[in-house]
Amino acid sequence: NQNNFIEFKGKSEKILAEDISSPLKIYELFLETISKENGSSISCEQTPKNLYYLEEILDFFPDAKVINLVRDQRDVLLSQKNKWKRRFLGAKSIPMIEAIRSFVNYHPILTAKVWNSSLYQTSKFRSNSRVKIVKFEDLLVDSRIQVHEICKFLEIDFQENMLKVPVIGSSTENDSKSELVIDSSKISKWKKGGLTSSEIYLSQNLSSNMMDEFGYEKETFTFPPIMVVLH
């Protein structure tokens, strides 16, 4: 319980009293402890930056499998642009300062470069049998098929409730925890507004090669939008 510092400190010291040879060993102990406390036999970790350390992770954890979810860069851009709104759409625990930071830090060029970099890293593991790349759009359109494939990859049984997902976490809509569904309306939300033509142009221009490699069709521009110069 990280909210209780004394309790958390005591548990940490007890765990770390074991022989620790590397930061990855600490991470392994952390995963084992959290999984045990929650009665789980499988640890599931979703830190995006882990993508940049896949080689080390796969080497240190021989039984680990990785699912890399890829989404249209323009929808990612729209999400990042509106990320600051999460505090007002159901995530009330997000501090106001964090909402302000998200608003100030947004920039289409930076977001596009991060997306492009992550997809470049992803492409290196396309032939790795322990890494499965899933397009977000495919998951929403063919939910049952895609979830079955994911279960097969993970060697776990498919369960019907895997298709019942609370509609939360959006940066453009209010949370709806009572609505349990894989929401296909999330596909190509950027086409419904929210991004300027300049943002779309920059996004596509900076991510062109990776968009082509992962099958994302680009919007055509005869000339660059005039407002591009402001970015």
Give, region by region, the residue ranges found by the protein language model.
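A structural motif corresponding to the C-terminal end of an alpha-helix
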Residues: 34-37, 118-131, 199, 206, ...
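Membrane-proximal basic amphipathic "stem/tether" segments
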Residues: 217-231
